[in-house]
Amino acid sequence: VLDKLEQSKKEYILLTNAPRPNNTVINFLKNLGLDQSKCKKVSTSGEVALKYLKSKYKALKFFHVGPPRDFDLFKSFEEFKVNNLDESDFIICTGLYDNFSENLDYYKNLLKNKIDKKMVCTNPDLVVDRGSNREFCAGSVAKIFEDLGGDVEYFGKPYPLIYTQSA
């Protein structure tokens, strides 16, 4: 399909709600066998969020909700990561913790008294289907936070910023 688009001289961007920087997803796609020239046209929700975080939340302490595999998102400012939610200025949500991937009540209890903080959600998807398994995504945690009265900034499809930043 991408070859046909290029032959037709059509522009394209591969948009993904992966909560990781572009280079992480590009390396993944290369390992799958995607031609390197096509990998240059990748834009992730994580990359768009990262640019925003560096400009708006520079040097502020954050608490991460999500699995360790997403740590590469904030590697360039990891010195501001705190392990105590009360010490944070804001929350970055990239997904669910591996040991609480099916228990949304855990997140309701974790966040219920923290709605004074802003949450940045790097993947607004509520669920993802992996084969025959349906798994919750960061958007499910963000929705809980919003339902509690918290304020969430979303990065990824279908929210506008991923389209304007990727163009």
Regions found by a protein language model. Name each.
Residues 1-167:
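HAD-like aspartate-dependent phosphatase fold
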